[in-house]
């Protein structure tokens, strides 16, 4: 898939990022992971980010990363494009991106670098190095320590032809509007705030109609119902789901640091497609919190 073809894929439909399955000893569990992908396929996500943030990329060893991407590609080949996560320091991110390309992934999501703050010059050099190390399409994730400005993205757009996507996980309205107006149609724009459904309407108004859904992992029917309503301008359905499910869900998610991943794994277990525990430093939901989530999910009906 060429970078331009990947850009076209990312400009419509619901995107998601599958959980990574671990066993009780916290080892990667390839068979349940493949079964998860098979279960999700009929719901119709336009692309999946394998080994992304919700897939606990940050906890994977290099060998495990290769296994995760390979299972995703083998399971979804010919049906759902697989975009691999890549991140860390520049040389490490290059290694992940090149491995994903070698395995046959359709593109890569460049996750924020680790720990240290960086200047705009440093961020530009980092993204350029990763883009120049591969031929397939790259989407950069503006989040955490990676806060690219409109001017920096303009430089990257001119120097990295395979940089085709911009995912926003910061939520600064002024900055995003400036980026969207400065770069125009050069990128595919993705909403990437946690529990993106709550912000989908605002992002659509700013010229970003596409987002990635974490809840697709455990309430895929509802996730697609929300996306279809969002795409059709059915604000009544979107408002109902935000009010009845997503806002209480966010309140539960915010009870502890790292729960943005943990709550999704808890939901997958409740729906009958468990992905095992999260790896440290994340922690699983407490029993009472799981019960709260179960009550919320029950209101949505069968998935």
Swiss-Prot record:
Keywords: Lyase. It comes from Leptothrix cholodnii (strain ATCC 51168 / LMG 8142 / SP-6). GO terms for biological process: D-glucarate catabolic process. Pathway: Carbohydrate acid metabolism; D-glucarate degradation; 2,5-dioxopentanoate from D-glucarate: step 2/2. The keyword Oxidoreductase does not apply. This is Probable 5-dehydro-4-deoxyglucarate dehydratase. It catalyses: 5-dehydro-4-deoxy-D-glucarate + H(+) = 2,5-dioxopentanoate + CO2 + H2O. It is an enzyme of class 4 (lyase). It holds the Pfam family DHDPS. Its EC number is 4.2.1.41. GO terms for molecular function: 4-hydroxy-tetrahydrodipicolinate synthase activity; 5-dehydro-4-deoxyglucarate dehydratase activity. Belongs to the DapA family.
């Amino acid at each position: 898939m060429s970078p331009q073809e990947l850009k076209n894929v990312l400009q419509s439909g619901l995107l998601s990022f599958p959980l990574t399955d671990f066993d009780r000893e916290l080892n990667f569990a390839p068979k349940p992971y493949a079964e998860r992908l098979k279960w999700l396929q009929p719901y119709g996500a336009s692309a999946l980010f394998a080994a992304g943030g919700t897939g606990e990329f940050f906890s994977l060893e290099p060998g495990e990363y290769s296994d995760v991407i390979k299972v995703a590609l083998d399971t979804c080949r010919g049906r759902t494009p697989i975009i691999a996560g890549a991140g860390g320091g520049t040389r490490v991110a290059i290694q992940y991106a090149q491995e994903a390309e070698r395995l046959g992934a359709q593109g890569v999501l460049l996750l924020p670098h680790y720990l240290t703050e960086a200047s705009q010059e440093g961020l530009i050099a980092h993204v350029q190095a990763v883009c120049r190390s591969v031929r397939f399409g790259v989407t950069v994730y503006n989040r955490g320590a990676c806060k690219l400005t409109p001017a920096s993205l303009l430089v990257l757009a001119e120097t990295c032809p395979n940089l085709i996507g911009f995912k926003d996980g910061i939520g600064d309205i002024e900055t995003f509007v400036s980026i969207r107006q400065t770069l125009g149609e050069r990128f595919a724009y993705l909403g990437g705030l946690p529990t993106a459904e709550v912000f989908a309407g605002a992002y659509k108004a700013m010229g970003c109609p596409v987002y990635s859904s974490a809840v697709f992992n455990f309430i895929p029917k509802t996730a697609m119902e929300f996306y279809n309503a969002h795409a059709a301008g059915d604000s009544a359905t979107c408002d109902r789901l935000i009010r009845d499910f997503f806002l209480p869900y966010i309140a539960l998610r915010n009870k502890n640091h790292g729960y943005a991943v943990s709550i999704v794994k808890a939901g997958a277990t409740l729906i009958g497609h468990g992905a095992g525990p999260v790896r440290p430093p994340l922690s699983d939901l407490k029993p009472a919190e799981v019960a709260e989530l179960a009550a919320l999910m029950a209101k949505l009906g069968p998935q």
